[in-house]
Amino acid sequence: ELERLYGIKVLPIQADVSAGNDNAATVQNVIDKTIEEFGRIDVLINNAQASASGVSLAEHTTDQFDLAIYSGLYAAFYYMQACYPHLKETKGTVINFASGAGLFGNVGQCSYAAAKEGIRGLTRVAANEWGADDINVNVVCPLAWTAQLENFAEAYPDAFEANVHMPPMGHYGNVET
């Protein structure tokens, strides 16, 4: 459908990074097929994430925690390592997605928040290490104005002011509009 709508070449590949899998081999297969099909890698975007949201920290199982850490943090780690030589060659870009959930400790999102905060840290390190190779590494940390964020602002105005800056548009996105 993307090929038809936008006139671009698409390469669908199933690749599950999870506990118990040979993740390095899974990721290398994706990289090899990508190079075979397109000849180069200019951009890596790490956005996939699964988690057991809604489960409290006290009730979280190791399997639920692993789901988030493997599908988010480990996936970003494996893909970044595998893409590094190609991105170095093309002076490419990495865009990793984190989340406001990690910034504010959303109830019921312990594994998701942990994975996303890990991705933010990994991204900072890569930006510092890979900048010398002309690889641009950034993290996108979406944050929408929600009732929970409003409650945080009211309960902790100093922390809110120190950590949440007004976007350039002058307002926050709203998940409903």
Task: Walk through the language-model features, giving the residues of each.
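A glycine/serine/threonine-rich, flexible loop-to-helix segment
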Residues: 132, 142-167
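Active-site helix of classical SDR
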Residues: 80, 115, 123
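Alpha-helical segment proximal to the catalytic Tyr-Lys
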Residues: 85, 128-132
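Residue(s) in the substrate-gating loop at a strand-loop-helix junction
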Residues: 99
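Substrate-binding pocket helix/loop in short-chain dehydrogenase/reductase
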Residues: 55-57, 61-66, 160-163
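Active-site loop-to-helix junction immediately N-terminal to the catalytic Tyr of the SDR YXXXK motif
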Residues: 60, 105-113, 125
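A conserved structural motif in NAD(P)-dependent oxidoreductases
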Residues: 167-177
